Design a protein with these regions (language model features):
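Long, hydrophobic, well-ordered secondary-structure blocks that form the structural core
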Residues: 1-12
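C-terminal catalytic domain of Rieske-type non-heme iron oxygenases
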Residues: 12-15, 19-245
């Protein structure tokens, strides 16, 4: 590509932890120490994100502000009501751990499988077996590692409107998981349907439950009847996200 013919400008970029970090300014400097902080850098380095393989991406359009979409990932006390027939069957509601790193954060959701895992020696505990880590990366990224791979959620404003947004959901899997799928396919098992089930399961919870409730909340905010909102002590992630913006 002849960059001079297309008006393209080279932006500063680095690849680290399997992520591509790009600065929006041509003379910008990317400093991950400043962006993430030493503790989060160390934590990311302990994972194996760089081996993840991209499998699928979906786009969800919503009638709400993009920040409300991010907020749907920020607490679990609503699980017993909004997700009573879905997530609440696999997760304990109103039970989470949160830590902040600069303008970022990490929420730990408590799976019901932790009840059995806690009976094992601590040396056999696995963070993804008993919980779901949910990383918030300022300003618009939600990243969730799973035993099989990871979900990456990117929220964007749409149509230059504070009342519209869209989400891009990317699904990643570790190579050994995809190899297992291929091996099962060779035996005649429709193993790829297992991947489709993951996509559809995530979509049904996010699109049909979380985003519906958040869009309804957006309409309520537009009424002008609320002068302020109060975040509770069981919503530390929402405190952090609000301060970061």
């Amino acid at each position: 590509i002849d960059k001079d013919c297309y008006g393209l400008k080279e932006l500063p970029a680095i690849e680290k932890f399997g992520f591509l970090w790009v600065h929006p300014c041509t003379d910008g400097v990317i400093n991950l120490d400043d962006l993430l902080g030493e503790k989060l850098l160390t934590e990311f380095d302990s994972w194996d994100f760089q081996s993840l393989v991209f499998a699928n991406e979906e786009k969800y359009e919503t009638e709400m502000n993009w920040k409300l979409a991010i907020d749907t990932f920020g607490e679990t006390y609503h699980f017993s009501v909004l997700h009573k027939d879905s997530l609440f069957e696999s997760f304990h509601g109103n039970c989470q751990l949160f830590d902040s790193f600069k303008r970022n954060g990490r929420l730990i959701l408590c799976k019901r499988t932790i009840d059995e895992m806690r009976k094992l020696p601590e040396s056999e505990w696995n963070i993804c077996a008993g919980s779901l880590p949910v990383y918030y990366l300022f300003p618009n990224i939600i990243f969730m590692p799973t035993p099989e791979g990871a979900f990456l959620v990117k929220e964007y404003p749409a149509e230059k409107s504070p009342h519209k947004s869209f989400s891009k959901i990317s699904f990643y899997f570790y190579p050994h998981v995809l190899e297992q799928i291929d091996q099962l396919e060779k035996t005649g098992v429709d193993a790829k349907q297992l991947l489709e089930d993951q996509y559809n399961g995530f979509s049904s919870v996010i699109q049909d439950e979380d985003y519906v409730a958040a869009a309804s909340s957006h309409k309520g905010l537009l009424s002008g009847n609320l002068d302020f909102l109060t975040f509770g002590k069981n919503e530390p992630a929402l405190h952090q996200i609000g301060r970061a913006h």
